[in-house]
Amino acid sequence: MSIDESTAARVAKLARIKVEPAALPALAGEFNTILGFIEQLNEVDIDGVEPMTSVTPQVLKRRADVVADGDQQARVLSNAPDAREGFFAVPKVVE
């Protein structure tokens, strides 16, 4: 795959990056270099290699999935400038 100047301009527009017309050939060249590096990955033999989710073996500790209220209502509401009946109180906005 090769990137020409019009494609480079389109990518720049989609990325909301202002690129001067004089800089488009260099940008297209950089895109082509990047794509060349990516195409090298197709040459790697990955037959027999297991998919990985991480480069280090990790096992996540599991805990029981228990529904709880968190028992934090008083602490959370202590930060509120105004709380009533266990809820945040805010000024009325709509009449």
Curated annotation (Swiss-Prot):
Pfam families: GatC. It comes from the Bacteria. Its EC number is 6.3.5.-. It is an enzyme of class 6 (ligase). GO terms for biological process: glutaminyl-tRNAGln biosynthesis via transamidation; regulation of translational fidelity; translation. Keywords: ATP-binding, Ligase, Nucleotide-binding, Protein biosynthesis. InterPro entries: Asp/Glu-ADT_sf_sub_c (IPR036113), GatC (IPR003837). One of its GO terms (molecular function) is ATP binding. Transmembrane segments: none annotated. Gene3D superfamilies: Glu-tRNAGln amidotransferase C subunit, N-terminal domain. It catalyses: L-glutamyl-tRNA(Gln) + L-glutamine + ATP + H2O = L-glutaminyl-tRNA(Gln) + L-glutamate + ADP + phosphate + H(+); L-aspartyl-tRNA(Asn) + L-glutamine + ATP + H2O = L-asparaginyl-tRNA(Asn) + L-glutamate + ADP + phosphate + 2 H(+). The keyword Cytoplasm does not apply. The keyword Transit peptide does not apply. Allows the formation of correctly charged Asn-tRNA(Asn) or Gln-tRNA(Gln) through the transamidation of misacylated Asp-tRNA(Asn) or Glu-tRNA(Gln) in organisms which lack either or both of asparaginyl-tRNA or glutaminyl-tRNA synthetases. The reaction takes place in the presence of glutamine and ATP through an activated phospho-Asp-tRNA(Asn) or phospho-Glu-tRNA(Gln). Belongs to the GatC family. Heterotrimer of A, B and C subunits. This is Aspartyl/glutamyl-tRNA(Asn/Gln) amidotransferase subunit C. The gene is gatC.
